[in-house]
Structure formats: C-alpha cells, structure tokens
Amino acid sequence: MRPKLLSVEAALFLALPELARAATRKFDFEIGWVRANPDNAFERPVIGINGQWPIPTIEVDIGDRVIINAHNNLGNQSTSLHFHGLYMNGSTHMDGPAGVSQCPIIPGTSFTYNFTVDQPGTYWYHSHTAAQYPDGLRGPFIVHDKDFPYAKKYDEEVVLTLSDWYHDEMRSLIPQFMAKSNPSGAEPVPKNALMNETTNFTMSVQPEKTYLFRVINVGAFAGQYLWFEGHKMQIVEVDGIYTEEAEAEMIYISAAQRVSFLLTTKKDTSKNFPIVASMDTTLFDVLPPDLKYNSTGWLVYDKKAEKPVPATVDSLNPFDDMTLVPYDKMEILGKPDKEVVLDVKMDNLKDGKNYAFFNDITYTEAKVPTLYTALSAGKDAEDPAVYGTYTHSMVLKKNEIVQLVVNNLDSGRHPFHLHGHAFQSVYRSEEEAGIWADANVTEKNLPKTPMRRDTLVIYPNGNIVMRFKADNPGVWLFHCHIEWHVISGLIATFVEDPLALQETIEIPKNHLDACAAANMPTKGNAAANTEDFLDLTGENKPANTLPPGFTPRGIVALVFSCICGILGVAVVAWYGFSAPVGSTSAGALSAGLVENDSGDVHSAQKGPQETVVSPTGDARSH
C-alpha cells in the first residue's frame, strides 16, 4: 500500500503550485438604474452596477473561485445573472436563468453566485430575466490562461464589445412586440450600433505591435460584420475554444458570439484606419430612415492625423466559421446515441400575438424552476412529463452522444445557443436548402475535427447539425439568442442526468430565500404538484392554437380589411349625417360653440368650403 500512498502524495505536491495560483474573486454588485447617453442621441435609464454603466468587466484566471453577491436595487424589476458560455460543471444551480435554475431576484433582495471557473477564454455575463439585458445589464467575462497557446505572439490585449442599441426600455418595447397589432411578429429595430458602448471608439496603437482582440457581441438582436481597414485578422478563439490560426479580412459575429484574433499594426504611422461594425440589416423587417446601422471606431497611429471616413465596400463576405479547426484537434464524436430534431417556425396563437416554436411548442415558464423539479421528483425526474409540456424538456442519459438537428422553417437567421456545453458544429446548410433529412449528407461527408462553440448561426430556411456529449449533469437551455425570439418562446430544455443531480446538488439557503421572497415553490412538477408528479393540472400554458387555415399573412389581411371596412362605413355615415353647407346644429349656434375634430370647444364660425374624397374616389363639396 505504501507505493500507492506515495503516488498520491506526489500528485498533491505537484498540484500545489496550481492550488496556490487559484484565488477567490469576490464581487459585490448593487444592480440599479443609472442614466446614460451612449450614442449621443438620447439619454435614457440603463441598468448599471454600483452606480456605473457600462458595467464592469470581470477578469479571472482559470481555476479561480468566483463569488458574486448580487443585490437588486432596481425597484421595479426582478433580475438574475447568467454567465454566458461557462459550463458550470457541477454548479448548474449557478447558471442564472430565472425560472430554470433559480427563482428571480426580486427588488430589494440579494442572491449569491458561487462557482469555480475551469475553462479559459472569452465570455460575458448578462441578465437572464424578462429580456432585460438590452437595457444595459451585460458585460465581458474574461478567463485568463497562463497556457494560452498564442501567449507569446501578442503584446497587448483588448476587449471590444459590439451591440445594437434601443432608445426605449424593454418594458415598453415588449408589449409593442407581443401585441395583436403586430401579428407578423416584426421585431423592434434598434436605433443605433455601439462599439464598446459608444459611437466614438478610438484605440491608440503603436507600430509593428500585435494585439489580441477579444470581440463580444452583447447585442439583443443584430449580428454584426466587423472589419479593420488595411489590416487582417488571425482568428485564434471562438466562444472559449482555441482554434488553429485562420486569416480573415471580415468576420460575422451574431448576438452572443465571441471571436478572438491577433492583429498586427503597420510600420507606417502617418495614417489612421477605420474599424467598421455593420449591423446585419437582413434581420430587420423595415429599415427606418433614421437607422444608423454602422458603428465606426479608429485605430489611431497619429493623434494629429485625420480620422478617415470608412470606404464603401462592394459586398459583405465574412470568414466562414465552419472552416475553423479547434487547436486541440478533437475529432468528431462517434455515432449518436440520441438524435433531437427541432423545427423552427413563427406563428400566431388564438390571442392574435406572434410566437416562436420548436416543434409546435412555444416555451412557457413552469411554476417551479425546472432544476428544482429535477431535484424533488425522485425517480420520476427521468420522465420528461414532470417538467411540463411547455418547457419542452428532453431528458438525456449520462455520457450519451447527442445529435441536435435544427431545421429553420423561417425566413430569417437565428443564432442558437446551448447552455452547459460547447457543441461540435458538424454541418450547416446554405440558405433555402430545406431540412436536414433531405440533405443527403453521410457521416463521411462530415468534418473530421469540427469547430466547437456554444452559439451557431442558422441560415434562412436551412439547417444545422451539432453534437455534444451529455457529460455535464444539469438543466440547460437551448434557445435563439435574438432576445425577441426568447420572449416569444424559441426555447427548449435539456435535463441532463437528473438522478446524478439529486446526489450532487444542494440548493443554498440563499437561493431558497429568493424563492420565498418571490412566492415561488421549490418542489413539485411544472404545475407545483408534489403529490403526483405526473399530474400537470394547473400548469402554465400559452394561448390556444388558431383554427386551421389561419396564418400571420391571413391575420394581417383580415385586420386591415376590417379596419378599411370600418373606416369606409364611418365615412359614409359621417357624410350622410353631415349638415348642409353653412349650417350648424341649433343647439351649438344658440350657445355660440362648436367642437373641432379633437374635441376642443371653440366659438362657432363659418369656415371655407371643404372638399372631401368619398370612398369611391369622387370629390364632393359640402
């Protein structure tokens, strides 16, 4: 037995330097409203931390323990924090989505996140409650790595965020979006694009130096094309996964994606160069005349030289991220044990509003956070039914290889994000290619070492195929990261090895207190039933479906037909009952008063003869 003991001691001794380097990083966050005007066009309330906005960048080292004490000072909104891209291995209860892995943090209360970071790379943190993060609660989360393979190739590191920006708060935009008057589901178009939360980003650079850029799209909606005039990028990381170097002149970054690259400056310092980020306007249903879809910054070599206007580009041809090769050259996972196929569509329900669906299910939050159902359901936790119909939960067995197929039956792009994992991106079709089942692609056609990331763009009416290993017990969302589509229900849930969760996860009292404050149960199925976990009576449900034959286009046509009909009848009635020229009702004349169109009362007077166009188009005078 002595040799075995010595080997353990030796292992502990060798681990001591790593343990010594790991630290506990503690953050106290007071989350509250501040005012800001990032685009110099409109000052508005934004959600800041500790009285400041933009919110702080969190920087830690791999192996560090992170403790965040979050206190909600918003007064009028609940909140939560999600750490986008972090696997939260062994800590699924720290993932952050309210109603999924925790209860919301209601105003005036606090919540503690406590987890260890065991992966390097570029991430971000943001609210995961009620589509709140576009109001400003979003910031970078950087995990440094002493073993970064490109550490000796750069001189300086830069974090660069891109985002769209709205002048109205989400609490006013959401009711406009989810309204009967918007049956086609047209998403609100942002007012501006920001670069590092400003429209005037400048970066002083030195000649012949190499910079590591960590770029994060923290926006709510728009993907962005990014390029540096006169310079090339060497991509070295996407979504926390190191890659082999890949040269690019232009990249596309969807909402929630991250790309890191090396950029080497020129020897000549006589000129400055534009940095251009251009929003993907194909996502917008309309292009308002005041829309500013480009954001321009500058690489400044000479502060005295002019900052040139960006040159016009003939076309937008970004680097294809599907061609990236992971640095560790991890090979494609083997034959899938389980295939999940999700069909994306947008449609209306009986309340007249437009919703988003996976396989005809639009996500509706359960009465009990899904994780808490998994922890309290006993052996029933392996039955997807206990999580409710409308959380769209799928139970995964330990270590099974999952092939996740998404067929986009919609005419727009979507960035799909998986919590708890980086998946292998094994296939992406072109636009209008149809569904995966018709693709005629075999295993030998798939890449040997596919790119891995946690957020992948699917093209209009196309498909994507991803693979991952169910080796991280937890409750993990899969959803579109366009925040408007999160609101409208484009979410599914993976419940991974729930019996292992029951053995390893203990919910802290601080988290249970948050549920008590929010008056939310912490045990039971989706309907909060603790007696019979298969009885879903009383579960939260979306509106009923429409009768067959109704489509968004048909609803729009019906609505406008009704409006036109009502207006037509009103005009005819008004014309038929109008008084002869020069006359006014006796009562109004006797009082010397008449009402104008707005209802204001004015002294009676004869106006000039008016010409009115009848519903038939004839001009009539009265």
Swiss-Prot record:
This is Iron transport multicopper oxidase FET3. Its EC number is 1.-.-.-. Residues 23-553 are extracellular. It comes from Gibberella zeae (strain ATCC MYA-4620 / CBS 123657 / FGSC 9075 / NRRL 31084 / PH-1) (Wheat head blight fungus). It is a single-pass type I membrane protein. It is found in: Cell membrane. Cu cation 3 binds at residues 128, 419, 479. One of its GO terms (cellular component) is high-affinity iron permease complex. The chain crosses the membrane at residues 554-574. GO terms for biological process: cellular response to iron ion starvation; reductive iron assimilation. It comes from the Eukaryota. Gene3D superfamilies: Cupredoxins - blue copper proteins. Cu cation 4 binds at residues 414, 480, 485.
